[in-house]
């Protein structure tokens, strides 16, 4: 059987992960305890491992990333067989979120900005901390995508779980592009993945 790993990445002790166990799957947790942080931003430190498993988990054919506050239930082999039988990357769709369904990164960006504006009225003393990320950076990134022809309503991932055959060429290219968008643009990774997938189609 091919080598398989389930992993998470946590910097800044936001979550306390429970070691996940599943037959035939190894467990890894990247954190400041075993990895040197490169950025002042803990979010980006964690995202680097989330997005780039081909750099850190080369010995594994399959990987499943999960957010640090999640638990694994069910058969992971069945999940991989179902969703990676003819693809190298699989996410859950944000449109399946019953409380907050969306299929468009542009709408997601506007929702983040609107929520920050609302919070700013309630707690102006918090300033930019009212926003999940810098609203000017988010808007600039969305303007760039629109200018490059990225269509609206072209799908929106939720990034809490990612299934990958991460050493495949198309997966590596898309993940490297995604990391550049997160590194130099918004740390809100769901804003940029669908653009990167569209760019690498």
Q: How would you describe each model-predicted region?
A:
Residues 12, 33-34, 70, 94-98:
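Short beta-alpha junction loops
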Residues 54, 77-81, 196-197:
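Short active-site loop/helix that positions an aromatic residue
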Residues 61-70:
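Short beta-strand-to-loop acidic/aromatic patch adjacent to the donor-nucleotide binding site
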Residues 72-115:
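Conserved donor-nucleotide/metal-binding helix-loop-beta segment in metal-dependent transferases, i.e.
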Residues 104-132:
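Low-complexity, serine/threonine/proline-enriched polar segments
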Residues 121-201:
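Catalytic core and acceptor-binding pocket of nucleotide-sugar-dependent glycosyltransferases
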